[in-house]
Amino acid sequence: MPIRKVEPKDKEELEELANKYLVPLYGDQTKALNERLTGYNYKHALVFEADNGEIEGLVAVSDKPGKNYVKLSTLVVKEEYLNKGIGKSLLEVALKYAKKSGKKEISVTVGEEVEENLHFFCKYGFKLKKELQDKYREGKKELVLVREIK
């Protein structure tokens, strides 16, 4: 499986991914991207890479010490690679990480208006925990979804 850790050389390609898919939903991603490349999330950020070296998707998990859950902070797949099992593969890696870490839950926040994301996570056992208004973007509702780790 072509999943590997994020490396500093990925910065430009990940910036393109963030600008196309994340900025419209969550605003500026500079800080989060830098954390995934060099800081807090570096060891928990993985990319799905094609044979030609192109990054097709990204998953990042935030794991704060002392918490009984992890947060799926990013899961994004390029549009041209949707419905090829990449999102499922990246999610499975995050779920395995959560289980191996002894966590009880994994959570993810999705924009209410992006129905395909909501359906994707619900298909894999995530359930609505709460709604957040204006957390990332003014006038936008976010849904916090949680899945128990067994």
Label the predicted regions.
Residues 1, 73, 141-143:
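Extracytoplasmic/periplasmic beta-strand context in beta-sandwich domains
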Residues 1-9, 147-150:
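Conserved N-terminal entry element of GNAT/NAT acetyltransferase domains
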Residues 5-74, 78-80, 91-92, 97, ...:
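Acetyl-CoA-dependent GNAT
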Residues 54, 78-92, 101, 112-118, ...:
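Conserved glycine-rich acetyl-CoA-binding loop
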Residues 84, 88, 139-149:
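Accessory recognition modules or surfaces
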Residues 98-110:
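Conserved GNAT acetyl-CoA-binding A-motif
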Residues 107-111, 122-143:
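Conserved catalytic-core motifs of GNAT/GCN5-like acyltransferases
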